[in-house]
């Protein structure tokens, strides 16, 4: 049996921690039930959102890395999911982010993505980090560019559509 540890990381305003069903799932299910998820695979009902959360946690077991629940330290509120992602069939190892609607516009995705990228380089030894962004997701494209990433290529995913693959050129 694989055992794994999800590291807890703190940055200025945020706490990276493992996803906790009791604390996080209601907000996660609301997020996945919203129109906001059109760039993250589409809306899910509550039971499908639970399975998506289980897959997210399983990624840590299979790959040894994954996504963290992001908590605002000042309030204890769940802000979203940010982390490292590379499921079967995905075009590249990537930094991904999804911030719940009420926490957007505060720089949380940027702050978290900077630290997740640093973790990929320093703790995991990645040579390159990407972000795979569905065409049309202007907010995520803007964040990738703010992070210093450049458009490297596009990739047609069989179920998701056209991904724009941004390469993060800034190292640790």
Locations of regions flagged by a protein language model:
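Active-site rim helix/loop that mediates acceptor-substrate recognition in acyltransferases
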Residues: 46-64
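Donor nucleotide-sugar recognition loop
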Residues: 41-44
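Acyl-donor (CoA/ACP) binding surface of acyl/acetyltransferases
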Residues: 1-39, 54, 58, 67-172
């Amino acid at each position: 049996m694989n055992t794994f540890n999800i590291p807890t990381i703190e940055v200025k305003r945020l706490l990276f921690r493992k996803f906790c069903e009791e604390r996080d799932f209601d907000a996660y299910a609301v997020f996945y039930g919203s129109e906001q998820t059109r760039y993250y695979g589409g809306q899910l009902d509550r039971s499908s959102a639970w399975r998506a959360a289980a897959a997210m946690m399983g990624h840590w077991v299979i790959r040894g890395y994954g996504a963290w629940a992001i908590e605002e330290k000042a309030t204890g509120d769940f802000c979203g999911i940010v982390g490292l992602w590379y499921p079967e069939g995905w075009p590249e190892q990537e930094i991904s982010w999804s911030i719940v609607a009420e926490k957007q516009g505060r720089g949380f995705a940027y702050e978290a993505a900077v630290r997740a990228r640093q973790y990929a380089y320093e703790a995991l030894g990645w040579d390159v980090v990407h972000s795979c962004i569905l065409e049309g997701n202007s907010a995520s494209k803007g964040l990738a560019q703010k992070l210093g990433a450049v458009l490297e290529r596009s990739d047609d995913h069989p179920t998701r559509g056209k991904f724009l693959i941004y390469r993060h050129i800034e190292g640790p």
